[in-house]
Amino acid sequence: MVVGAIAAFVLIPVRQELMPHSSPDLQPLEFGQLPPRPRISRAATLPAERSPKVRTLILYDHAGQWGWTGRLDATFTANLIGHFGSWKAQPASEYTGGELERYTATVYLGSLFGQRLPHALLDDVLSTQRPVIWVGYNIGELEDRAPDFRAQYGWRTSFLDRSPVATVRYKGASLTHWTHNDAGIMGYSSVDRSRARVLATAVRANGSTFPWAVRSRNLTYIGEMPFRYTSETDRVLAFDDLLFDALAPRARERHRALVRLEDINPVSDASQLRRAADYLHSKGIPFGFGVSPYYRDPQAHEDPPHELRLHNSPQVVAAIKYLERKGGVLVEHGYTHQWDGGSNPYDGQTGDDVEFYRVTESEDGQIHDVGPLPEDTVAWSEHRVVAANHEFAASGIAAPRIFEFPHYTASANAYRAVAHWFAVRWERSDYFPGLLGDSPVEYDHIEGQFFPYVVHDVYGSKVLPENLGSIAPSTWHTYKERLPADLVRAARANLVVRDGFASFYFHPFLALKYLKRTVEGIERLGYLFVSPASL
């Protein structure tokens, strides 16, 4: 799984010479001084492709000590289905006869092995004409319930194949599969290809193959849970695309791209910002740019100043306005992009640390998501969001309409707070068991998810995708080098998603050649760069 947002992509610390600036003259917003929340029209910000007529029933396993995995799998699925329409998620054990006939399609998530499923559910799956997607375990329950499953569907499973699988072939592309994932993929005793279609194929290390996903009649079966150990080029993309067959079969093929300039703050080099904007504008490419408007370095790791507000950084303010004139869309990237309570996890400096969650680093460089900060409440998070908007206003900059969590890491309270002020986020996001309302939020199990298309997630927000990551010219801490060719390779894999994106971010302090190579490589694949404001 993608464990925690920081672990999912590379972080690059901001390191540059800082010059003294005038002391702040703006009084910070006092805690509790929250203005009325804005009125946000959720209907106006739903994904354009989303249809009110598309309703999906999500059924999941939830029993026992591993029940949290089923709740998370259902959350991930609900997020993806938020691209297409509405959904209802409930434990499979609570299914009542005839229920699936009220929905466009049904997805059953077999996260836990050996679950006994209601006969009413099995009988309805066997008799319905509506699309059913069955994922992972417990397919034997359905096979045994049918009088002659093989005769009806043309295939029959056998046992979990635990052979190392490095590739899943789908629509002519080779998608990656982590070879150390030993949970297994369901094997088959027989597949009659005259009656069953093999949609995707697992390739063992020795080159032999077996079906990864099959379809016959209205039933699609995927032989493993695709949310385990994912990456930007992973077989989860096949699942992301297969949802179209059930929920939007007439969707047209199109491939769009997004780019965002990242980690801008009051001590950024204005000339570097202008340089990146000039290149993108010269190519006719709209872009976003993420700004944290209050620079903090309470541990004094850099030369003075150790704090600087945006309105006291006239060169950066002018550069932000320049970016907007060149087609850039402002994104609020937190307030300070750090935490004053200590290293979180690195050095307490803006751009390096997490703002809305407690994170630590062990001696061997491993990152650990600890849990909510001591201050964590919806009101505390709202205060920081409003304080950032206050700082933009003091700088003569219109408040942004898109939010991005620093290092893509936050508590459930923080996500709820942001949803009160922003209809749209642009990021990868963290999710927890309990967000479906079936249990309290469980912070012991934090998992990240990124999307190949625009979704409406369980926090109630539209989420624009960031699914390629960023450029890292060299290894930093435990994070490996990542070059333009790696991002372009990921963009190529994402072409299997019929209405998917190639979305990445770029730190302007890096050499411009990296941005050029990435943009031009993505364009050569046929992607069209669009403005985040258009979504």
Regions found by a protein language model. Name each.
Residues 368-455, 510-515:
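Catalytic domains of cell-wall/extracellular-matrix polysaccharide-remodeling enzymes
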Residues 201-256:
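Non-catalytic propeptide/linker segments at domain boundaries
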Residues 163-218, 224:
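Catalytic beta-strand/loop cores that center a nucleophilic Ser/Cys/Thr
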Residues 57, 140-141, 286-413, 468, ...:
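Metal-dependent polysaccharide deacetylase catalytic core of the NodB/CE4 family, i.e.
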Residues 89, 243-253, 271, 275-297, ...:
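C-terminal domain-boundary segment and adjacent tail
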Residues 8-102, 253, 280, 289:
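Aromatic-Pro/Gly-enriched surface loop or interdomain linker
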Residues 108, 112-179:
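A glycine-rich, often tryptophan-bearing local segment used as a flexible ligand/cofactor-contacting loop or short
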Residues 256-266, 270, 379-402, 408, ...:
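Catalytic grooves of carbohydrate-active enzymes
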